[in-house]
Amino acid sequence: MDKKQVTDLRSELLDSRFGAKSISTIAESKRFPLHEMRDDVAFQIINDELYLDGNARQNLATFCQTWDDDNVHKLMDLSINKNWIDKEEYPQSAAIDLRCVNMVADLWHAPAPKNGQAVGTNTIGSSEACMLGGMAMKWRWRKRMEAAGKPTNKPNLVCGPVQICWHKFARYWDVELREIPMRPGQLFMDPKRMIEACDENTIGVVPTFGVTYTGNYEFPQPLHDALDKFQADTGIDIDMHIDAASGGFLAPFVAPDIVWDFRLPRVKSISASGHKFGLAPLGCGWVIWRDEEALPQELVFNVDYLGGQIGTFAINFSRPAGQVIAQYYEFLRLGREGYTKVQNASYQVAAYLADEIAKLGPYEFICTGRPDEGIPAVCFKLKDGEDPGYTLYDLSERLRLRGWQVPAFTLGGEATDIVVMRIMCRRGFEMDFAELLLEDYKASLKYLSDHPKLQGIAQQNSFKHT
């Protein structure tokens, strides 16, 4: 071994990570690295880069959970190498999955299953759950049309202002999306416009129980009743799928009198995010069908499980089982009582913010975060004809300088001239944290007032509604 090799070896063994040779070069980003490096150095490089991400706890744009207790981290670590799709190899994880399906079905008032096991599945998130619910709708509709001897080449789906996953579903599965556009004073699907869009080629109607733009509920019951009348008048029977990405784990606990779920006979399936208000870590969603008849069997694949067969219906395959296991932990840990307390706390924060922000400017509130109105979100716009000397984009940009990610964006459809600001209140965004946001909000308003030349220059460049 020559002197240089000895020096290099000594460096690798003894040098501190910030004195190591491998940290004195820029990390590879375009080509696969040629050489190995010390694990502590590789970790340090990546760890330092992650500091440039936003602080997840201050992200008030996301609907997703940004706080998990230590036990969730432990369970995720224990499950990192358990493959969710391998039911035979990990039977207890599979059993936990089935228990969660039963619990969610019970929460949403699904009819008691004939064999004791509810019909549903875990997914990577509510978007995959929507895809599966949409596929089942299309297959059921196609079967009915074929039985009636009618063509099946022009399916359509009727919805209000939906999350982009429904646009993807329509494109991927060749379905015409008839989206009822937002318009001033009418920001979600109403029965009249819904019925005008329906015909015998409608595979289903999809209300969003927690509209992503504003946080308001698109209440399913009036739409359901209108479809009953439509069937009585035309003979056309149309199913419903409820996209309850956020509301599915809120209303059962804080607004149980809202009839939105399987209590409505036309509702054949419901999807929701476990990793939003289900309180699970990222990567967990659920879709539940009313019964076995609502899920066409040709979409189900059977895999080995405990010496027998179990049906699976999913788009994704290999992924860790930790998210499902963590969801089960939250169900056991909190129960109905605990979920009610956690969700009520978020609504209390939303109500407090709405009351305080209303005092600070000429705002018109679209959602004030009341349990009977929608999810715990505060959404507002500047009142028509008012010019406070700043835009909501300016305000969003100033708050970002303090780490707060509070989006300002335009609405969709025929309301693209309306700019709103939306604040999501979730577990971990407690009252004291909300008070700190208000202090920075007031400081931002003062800064904009003191620097009028800076007003109106910020653009919608920090948030894209998807």
Curated annotation (Swiss-Prot):
Name its GO BP terms in alphabetical order: glutamate catabolic process
Q: Can you tell me which residues the record assigns to a coiled coil?
A: none
Q: Which residues carry this modification: N6-(pyridoxal phosphate)lysine?
A: 276
- Where do the annotations place substrate binding? 62, 83
Q: Which PROSITE patterns match?
A: DDC_GAD_HDC_YDC
**Keywords, alphabetical:** Acetylation, Decarboxylase, Lyase, Pyridoxal phosphate
Claim: NADP is one of the keywords in the record: no
Per the record, the domain of life is Bacteria
One matching Pfam family, short form?
A: Pyridoxal_deC
Q: Main EC class of this protein?
A: lyase
Q: What's an example GO cellular component term for this entry?
A: cytosol
Binding of pyridoxal 5'-phosphate occurs at 126-127, 212, 275
> What chemistry does it catalyse, as a reaction equation?
L-glutamate + H(+) = 4-aminobutanoate + CO2
Q: Which cofactor does it need?
A: pyridoxal 5'-phosphate
Q: Which GO terms describe its molecular function?
A: glutamate decarboxylase activity; pyridoxal phosphate binding
Task: Write out the function statement from the record.
Answer: Converts glutamate to gamma-aminobutyrate (GABA), consuming one intracellular proton in the reaction. The gad system helps to maintain a near-neutral intracellular pH when cells are exposed to extremely acidic conditions. The ability to survive transit through the acidic conditions of the stomach is essential for successful colonization of the mammalian host by commensal and pathogenic bacteria.
Assembly with partners or alone: Homohexamer composed of three dimers.
What is the official name of this protein in its record?
Glutamate decarboxylase beta
What is the species listed in this Swiss-Prot or TrEMBL entry?
Answer: Escherichia coli O6:H1 (strain CFT073 / ATCC 700928 / UPEC)
Q: What is the lineage of its organism?
A: Bacteria, Pseudomonadati, Pseudomonadota, Gammaproteobacteria, Enterobacterales
